[in-house]
Amino acid sequence: MEIEKILGEMEGLWKKVIDKVIKSPKGNLSREEKYNLYAFTIIQLGRTSAQANLIQEAVNTRLCTIAKKHLEILRNSENSDKYKDITDDELNHISFNFPYPAVLALQTQFQLINTCIDLQFKILINKTKVSFITSNNPAAKYSQFLERMGVKNYALGSRGLQIFIPLTPFIGVMFYDPKCYKLGDRKKNYVELTQEKDIEELNKLTASNAEGVLYYLPGSISENQLEKLSGQNKYYKPQKRVEEYPEIPTADGVIVGSYHCSLFCKLSLSFVKELPRYRTLRKQDFNCREHLLREIAYIKDEIVRKTF
């Protein structure tokens, strides 16, 4: 398939920059290398079974809602007796078989690849004795700012977006909204993490985002710690991946829609500081039109054009 060919070409570029970061985490990256690291991280968000399952559930939820609405119309028709034995509860148990959700998830992610081009990143160097864990859904989205504001969900265009992905047990990368946060020293492209609490918090995020499978350095995690991480996944991972929007009535009927439920795990990181404009904002002063979304910047240059 064409998408597999594109992935094969890009994976070679991604491997080069990841190997360079692992070998020299404090070193500088070229503009193209920075973009390749960014592209790897963004594509990874849609390249997992978790995202495929999310797509499947989103399609199922939407089609189930449409089926209920169609049934409602049929019940009000002249032949309503034909449909009286069909209940909404029965429709809730119907599963619509959507072919190749993983392919659609990946295609969608490619279309969204430059949605987060305005984010900056820092290499996270773990200097503690506690190693990073990873999972079968390794790239985790978050927004500490929107969590503090009490907003129920976030997406790639949200204010305060953060994306964390561990590369090794002691090297990770975090992309972040530079208008909302400061990470470490502004003059450095890395942050040295010396507090075990920060590693535990990042591991909590990774565990909560996992799709049932964790990976860790042999001997680095005790059985009690594994049970704790498993408990965090069960507690913080949304029980439902997809929720329906309230119906919007129109002259031609109603508009129905759905949204993805976001992960919130009370993330607390000592090296992430909100900038004054947002740090001083209180929940009661939060305005969706002003504070919910970022001004997305699309860089129209040769590096970006190579990805299309």
Predicted regions and their residues:
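Alpha-helical structural context detector biased toward long hydrophobic helices
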Residues: 1-308
